[in-house]
C-alpha cells in the first residue's frame, strides 16, 4: 500500500511497508470509532511523507468526506489558517500538536473561531495542558482525541477521548 520511514527515535530511521489489509482495517476502525462520515470536511495538515496524513487521505476515501489540503504557508499565519478552516467549513482536524499550538501561541482565536469544527484530534507530541484548554474553551462541544501509535502498526494503537478541562498537577500530587 505504502512505505514510510520511522522517525528514528530508537536509532537510525527505517523504512516500513504497510500493506493494504493493515490500512483497510485501521481506517475501518478509525472512521467508525470517531464517527467520520460523508458529511465531514477533513482539514489536512500533515505532509504526505508523515503517516498522520494516512488518516486524512483514507478516511475521506472510505467515507466520502471532503479532504481539504491546507496550504503549508497557512501554518505561518494563524489568521490565514483560521480563515481557511472557516471558509472551507472544516469539521475535522487530525493534526500534530505543534500545529494546534501555533493557533493558541499566536492568539489566533482573538481573530476568529471557525464555526464548523467538531472533531479535533492530535498526535506526535505531548499536548501542553495550557494549549489543550485554550482549544477546549473555544470548542466545548467538540470531540478532542489524543492519538498515539508508532509507524510500524499503521498509525495509531491507542487513543484517549478527552472529557475534562485539565489543570497542571501539583508536585504534591506526584508523591
Regions found by a protein language model. Give the residues of each.
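AMP-binding/adenylate-forming domain of the ANL superfamily
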Residues: 1-3, 18-19, 25, 128-133, ...
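Conserved AMP-binding/adenylation subdomain of ANL enzymes
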Residues: 14-43, 47, 51-91, 160-162
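Single conserved hydrophobic/aromatic residue that forms the stacking wall/gate
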Residues: 166-175
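Conserved adenylation A10 loop of the ANL superfamily
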Residues: 3-16, 141, 167
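Conserved donor-binding loops in enzymes that form glycosidic bonds
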Residues: 5, 46-47, 71-72, 90, ...
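Amphipathic alpha-helical recognition patches that constitute DNA-binding helices
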Residues: 1, 22-25, 41, 80, ...
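Alpha-helix N-cap/helix-start capping motif
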Residues: 20-21, 97-98, 125-129, 172
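Gly/Ser/Thr-rich phosphate-binding loop
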Residues: 62-65, 90-94, 104-165
Amino acid at each position: 500500500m505504502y512505505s514510510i520511514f520511522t522517525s528514528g527515535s530508537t536509532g537510525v530511521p527505517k523504512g516500513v511497508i504497510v500493506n493494504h489489509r493493515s490500512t483497510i482495517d485501521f481506517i475501518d476502525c478509525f472512521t467508525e470509532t470517531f464517527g467520520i462520515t460523508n458529511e465531514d470536511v477533513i482539514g489536512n495538515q500533515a505532509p504526505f511523507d508523515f503517516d498522520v496524513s494516512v488518516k486524512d487521505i483514507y478516511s475521506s476515501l472510505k467515507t466520502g468526506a471532503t479532504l481539504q489540503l491546507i496550504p503549508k504557508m497557512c501554518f505561518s499565519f494563524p489568521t490565514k489558517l483560521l480563515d481557511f478552516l472557516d471558509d472551507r467549513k472544516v469539521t475535522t482536524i487530525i493534526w500534530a500538536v505543534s500545529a494546534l499550538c501555533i493557533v493558541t501561541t499566536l492568539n489566533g482565536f482573538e481573530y476568529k473561531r471557525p464555526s464548523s469544527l467538531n472533531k479535533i484530534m492530535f498526535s506526535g507530541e505531548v499536548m501542553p495542558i495550557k494549549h489543550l484548554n485554550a482549544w477546549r474553551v473555544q470548542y466545548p462541544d467538540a470531540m478532542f482525541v489524543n492519538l498515539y501509535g508508532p509507524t510500524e502498526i499503521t498509525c495509531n494503537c491507542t487513543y484517549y477521548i478527552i472529557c475534562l478541562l485539565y489543570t497542571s498537577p501539583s508536585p504534591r500530587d506526584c508523591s
